[in-house]
Amino acid sequence: MNRQLRTVKSCFSLQKTHQYRSFWIQSSLRALPPDVKQNKTEPIPFVPKPEEGSSNKSNSSKFRKRFLLLFLLGITGYSCSVVYCFKDPNFYDYFAEHTPFGKQVLYNVEQSWIGYKYLGGNRIKVDDSSPKLKQNSNNISKKQNSSRNDDTKVKKDTTIERPESLVVEIVDLPSEVTKDTAEESVWKDIGLDQETGLSVTAIPIITETLDHAHEQEIKDQSLRFESSLNEANELHGKLSKIQQEQEHLFEQRLREKVSEMESKLEALLIARDEKWQSAFESEKLRLQKLHEARLQQELFKLASVFESKLKNELTEQAITLEKLHLQSIKAQVEQERGSRLGRLQELRNSFQQLQELVRVVLHENGRVTRLVDVSNTLDDLNKDMRFHKLSEVRQHVNTLKEATKDDELAALASRVIEKIVDSGPILDKEELQTKFDTLSKEIYKTCFLTTESGFFGHLKSIILSQLPAAVFKSPDIVSVKKTLEDARSHLLKDDLDGSVRALLSLSQWPRALSRDWINACRRRMELQQAIEIIKASATLSSQLEDAQQA
């Protein structure tokens, strides 16, 4: 019992020390301003070493790795067994007796903060299963039963008054209950402090051992405990007052330090500004002087360059004046002489001008006659597109080729005309209209045919084509009828290109039927375009020659 009471007292002393320590830590943390943060050192990054090649590994390195692996496995198993000791009390005893350094390791772990906080080192084991304790408890219970035969089996609970933070209850139990409870190991948690892991809340219930203690000793211990608690409460009040005074003093000193540092900072800022201003002014003066010196050098260089240029210009002007003076003297000499050579030169120049004028007139007359011949031949070709007089047409084509051999575009157009003449006669406007009328009827008949139509289908198309188009409401028939009308209107306006485009927009069968008519239109359009190209090139060449002469 005395041993267990000493354990309780040691727990109370630890409680007081940790209360003092936690109080000072919390007071210092509260006194710090919110801007202050704890400095956290950044971890040094781990730079892995370059791996060695697998081919260069020796037997010693393999043995070293195996040894390290076995060592790590042994340490891991040893640490796991230490952790399991705090879970199973039987394994705790076995580990302490049969494992090397078992007792020392378990004791150190129990006394460390890890044992108190995580492994249950703050629990006090009350093991009443030993035979000596059982014999003592049986003897004491027999004596108590013989002396108290008239008393009841269970006494009333006696409580000792404690301060608000601690109450210990002493309960007398019968021997049968104590025997049952003595066979098990009882673990009770004292409670954990947030910082150290020590118990600060509860006291282990050691009812069996307290039954065997003397009442006077229990009272003495309780009085001592009450006095120690009263002292602790008084110390707590004093500490709270000291803490308040220290907080007030710290705040006052903090304000003084802040004001002092602000004044120092302002003085440093003013001194820095003055220093910067003086440095700026000195640098400004230095740069101004440097810039002025450079400007003076540049001005001197430019002045020398300009002076040399002026001298050169004056010399050039003097030379030109001398040349003009010599020319004027020569002119006066020539005028005064009036020799025959001068008159003969004038006559020669006038004769050359007359020759050039005659040449120009002859060239102009030839060009005009050539243009007249070209225009006449083109008019004849345009009038006689049926080529009734084929020999005359060929003569016209030959004259065109000779007249347009110098112009590439006109020569190309004349070759096109020659190909068209060789291919045969060209249809005129009336013939194209008559052929288009018959073609439009055939195209209209194809609207009622399909790709699989036979003899009866063709008869049906002939009959239906005789009916008016308003009877049919099919969009295909309406579109074909509209396309034919557009082509007819373009043909009446002499727009062969528009009529050909309209027919090409039809489907496959109508395009196949209108192929010959489209080819005839194309030949006529090619002939007309070639004639227009030759006329345009002739007029352009004449205008260019006139412009050159002008």
Swiss-Prot record:
Family: Belongs to the MICOS complex subunit Mic60 family.
GO cellular component term of the entry, any: mitochondrial crista junction
Cross-referenced InterPro entries: MIC60
Lineage: Eukaryota, Fungi, Dikarya, Ascomycota, Taphrinomycotina
Location relative to the cell: Mitochondrion inner membrane
Description of how the protein assembles with itself and partners: Component of the mitochondrial contact site and cristae organizing system (MICOS) complex.
Coiled coil: 214-275
The UniProt record lists the keyword Transmembrane helix: yes
Membrane topology, from the record: Single-pass membrane protein
Entry keyword Glycoprotein: no
Source organism of the structure: Schizosaccharomyces pombe (strain 972 / ATCC 24843)
Compositional bias per record (Basic and acidic residues), positions renumbered to this chain: 148-158
Membrane-spanning ranges: 67-86
Record's protein name: MICOS complex subunit mic60
PANTHER family found in the cross-reference section: MICOS COMPLEX SUBUNIT MIC60, MITOFILIN
Segments in the Mitochondrial matrix topological domain: 39-66
Region feature Disordered, mapped onto this chain: 35-59, 128-158
Role: Component of the MICOS complex, a large protein complex of the mitochondrial inner membrane that plays crucial roles in the maintenance of crista junctions, inner membrane architecture, and formation of contact sites to the outer membrane. Plays a role in keeping cristae membranes connected to the inner boundary membrane. Also promotes protein import via the mitochondrial intermembrane space assembly (MIA) pathway.
Keywords: Coiled coil, Membrane, Mitochondrion, Mitochondrion inner membrane, Transit peptide, Transmembrane, Transmembrane helix
Organelle targeting peptide span: 1-38
Low complexity bias locations: 132-147
Main subcellular location of this protein, as a coarse class: mitochondrion
